[in-house]
């Protein structure tokens, strides 16, 4: 068998991004054959990805890419906050955002089949799972085209993209507003009907407990609903930099119109797994006793 040299390990690592020890093991198993060792690692990394695929990914990053009148916002998830700061993970997310803007995939499946360099997005994702040891998923994305665009990222956990006409500074302020106040829609008319119905139901229950006449109760309910609509629609919110005016008034003063926006918050709506360390240890002890 050929001697396994440091240069061979380094060459295999450069090709596969696998950890050094994994590269050495693969070369040993392949008896020094680089091509065979690369194939062994591809299989191993794929197996790691398969094992990791069932694990919850509630951490991650939001990335934005804007080029002229085309842009994209994407959320890519991982398992831990630590990995969300990994350079390879961040580079992958930024490449994905750029690819979405340039290629206009219909959905995550179509995106996964596109290429980053010589590999598909899915192949790169699988390789990174094997290298880093955590599950990673492309959760969602939104693409914009044919309009002025601006984006705002609050760190890597909150991202907003705004389609607008007019002044970019004002549009950027609107994006920052969305990141800070997290509206669910652009205008009150756009608030999803199910959210309005839920808020109305809560308001009706509270108003009914007041014991006031029906006509007063009806006004109380309507007042509560209108207040809610103003709180959750971007244009109707008090502007965070000057609460004496609404976002809509701020934009109008700058001759700017926001046509649409997308807001992503990392892990929003994903139920995180709560680890019970004591229960985990107890289970391991019980399993060990059964094997004894």
From Swiss-Prot:
Protein name: Elongation factor Ts
The protein's role, per its UniProt record: Associates with the EF-Tu.GDP complex and induces the exchange of GDP to GTP. It remains bound to the aminoacyl-tRNA.EF-Tu.GTP complex up to the GTP hydrolysis stage on the ribosome.
GO MF terms held by the record: translation elongation factor activity
Listed PROSITE patterns: EF_TS_2
Database matches in InterPro entries: EF-Ts_dimer_sf (IPR036402), Transl_elong_EFTs/EF1B (IPR001816), Transl_elong_EFTs/EF1B_dimer (IPR014039), Transl_elong_Ts_CS (IPR018101), UBA-like_sf (IPR009060)
Domain of life: Bacteria
Family that this chain belongs to: Belongs to the EF-Ts family.
Keywords (A to Z) from UniProt: Cytoplasm, Elongation factor, Protein biosynthesis
Subcellular localization, as worded in the UniProt entry: Cytoplasm
Pfam short name (any one): EF_TS
